[in-house]
């Protein structure tokens, strides 16, 4: 039989950490004033009136750089706990981490070859 009572703290943390943002959005939606006017429709750029059109389309390159950053950031999240417990885990986990890094290197080379990392 599973001992689910050992996870009571986890479930309490999960419920509380989910309830706080939901309550924040609900309270701000109820308390926020609803006024429609020309100021709501204008864009705000550091306290001054915008010069030209405020609605610009971003180039797809920004999204590609963001995607590569997220992939490398997730790689760091997975590799940091492994690096902290490297001496305890031993060689089999080292081989698994090596394969993980190898897959990420192959993906980075693929993105580089496809031109995802080119700025111009």
UniProtKB/Swiss-Prot annotation:
UniProt GO cellular component terms: chloroplast thylakoid membrane; NADH dehydrogenase complex
Catalytic activity as recorded in UniProt: a plastoquinone + NADH + (n+1) H(+)(in) = a plastoquinol + NAD(+) + n H(+)(out); a plastoquinone + NADPH + (n+1) H(+)(in) = a plastoquinol + NADP(+) + n H(+)(out)
Residues annotated as transmembrane: 9-29, 64-84, 88-108
GO MF, one annotated term: quinone binding
Keywords, alphabetical: Chloroplast, Membrane, NAD, NADP, Plastid, Plastoquinone, Quinone, Thylakoid, Translocase, Transmembrane, Transmembrane helix, Transport
Broad enzyme group: translocase
Function: NDH shuttles electrons from NAD(P)H:plastoquinone, via FMN and iron-sulfur (Fe-S) centers, to quinones in the photosynthetic chain and possibly in a chloroplast respiratory chain. The immediate electron acceptor for the enzyme in this species is believed to be plastoquinone. Couples the redox reaction to proton translocation, and thus conserves the redox energy in a proton gradient.
Subunit composition and interactions: NDH is composed of at least 16 different subunits, 5 of which are encoded in the nucleus.
Protein name from the UniProt record: NAD(P)H-quinone oxidoreductase subunit 3, chloroplastic
Source organism: Gossypium barbadense
High-level lineage: Eukaryota, Viridiplantae, Streptophyta, Embryophyta, Tracheophyta
Name of the gene: ndhC
